[in-house]
Amino acid sequence: NAEQSQRALKKYRIFFAKLLTFNDVEGYCQPCLSPIWDTSLGGHALMEAGLDIGEKTLQAATDWLAERQILDVKGDWAVNHPDLQPGGWAFQYNNDYYPDVDDTAVVAMLLHRADPERYKEQIRRAEIWVIGMQSKNGGWGAFDIDNEYYLLQHIPFADHGALLDPPTADVSARCVSFLAQIGHGMEHQSVRRGIEYLKREQEPDGSWFGRWGNNYVYGTWSVLCALNAVGEDMNAPYIRKAVEWLRARQGADGGWGEDCAS
């Protein structure tokens, strides 16, 4: 009825207003909130800074993340793997039908670092789901398996191929890093296939493209982290080429950054 419609519209206006950000010269609308991603990266940063797991701040963060693992809903990903047991995390609040392996790997790595015994079951379910989401070519897409219908990219409104979710180096690197952290080396089929995929994806200049961040700097450091985690020879020529490429992109102020145009 009209009254219910008005209440719903008011609710959605408030929601969308939260996505708007303004400063003195411009404004923009972010597409969504990212609490899972932000909390897990924040937790990693706190651990790198030496915060003990017993600290209430970190304990609250890891417990909050553990409670949000999607264990009972088979989302859109199940179309390509209906028998796979759920076990991922989503990027946003309450998005049970679209967990992604990138968030899942980062969260599971944090839980493993913080307290592998306390979060043993969450890590186990994440491992099963991440391995099950690996594509035939050895890589991982963010949300789907073997989503490589490249003909769709020729549709005029496809926007850099965003209609698809093919395997990418950045996401694949995160999955390899997770599997390496929980004890799987090159003897593990998923890790071995993932590394082979990453080697094939390296650009001629030594870099890797990262789809979910800007762009080659993001992809390259992500892959280098994975190669280091899995125990690759960091003096191997292909790795040194990537390192030199990354060093050459350092800015005059000492930082790294990359324009979206790349």
Regions found by a protein language model. Name each.
Residues 1-262:
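Preference for long, amphipathic alpha-helical scaffolds in soluble/luminal domains
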